[in-house]
């Protein structure tokens, strides 16, 4: 039989904690960023990211699952129409937590949790690097084949040697141009 996790819950009871997370996630999707305590921000992060992952899929079943948690239909619509598709190329990491100054009244550690809107530069750079490497490998493969064929051609005929050298020179020039 599964046992509940030990330790205090936000709000005291399980139902109150569930309501707190639902309200925090609703506010996050509605406004894009919220200021809350550091503990609540860290706790609501996986909760919100799972909802965004469901919004990325965009199926009717996923929409109904999200509606069980977030009761505001306008927020659910914006989650599925705008927020989910904007994270289409990203595999997780939809939110960012930034620590801020402590709260004035009780000195509680505060944080801002926000949706990450900008595209990742590293993914685009990695993709460009992989494309360049694959093009370079494709260009080197015909040149390597031409070099392998050249020794066999030398043994057969000297005329074939000149043709192989011409092919290798053309491949080298094409590589320089690219």
Curated annotation (Swiss-Prot):
It comes from the Bacteria. Transmembrane segments: none annotated. Keywords: Ribonucleoprotein, Ribosomal protein. One of its GO terms (biological process) is translation. PROSITE patterns: RIBOSOMAL_L17. GO terms for cellular component: cytosolic large ribosomal subunit. InterPro entries: Ribosomal_bL17 (IPR000456), Ribosomal_bL17_CS (IPR047859), Ribosomal_bL17_sf (IPR036373). GO terms for molecular function: structural constituent of ribosome. Residues 126-178 are annotated as: Disordered. The keyword Zinc does not apply. Residues 140-163 have a biased composition (Low complexity). Residues 126-139, 164-178 have a biased composition (Basic and acidic residues). NCBIfam families: L17. Part of the 50S ribosomal subunit. Contacts protein L32. Belongs to the bacterial ribosomal protein bL17 family. This is Large ribosomal subunit protein bL17.
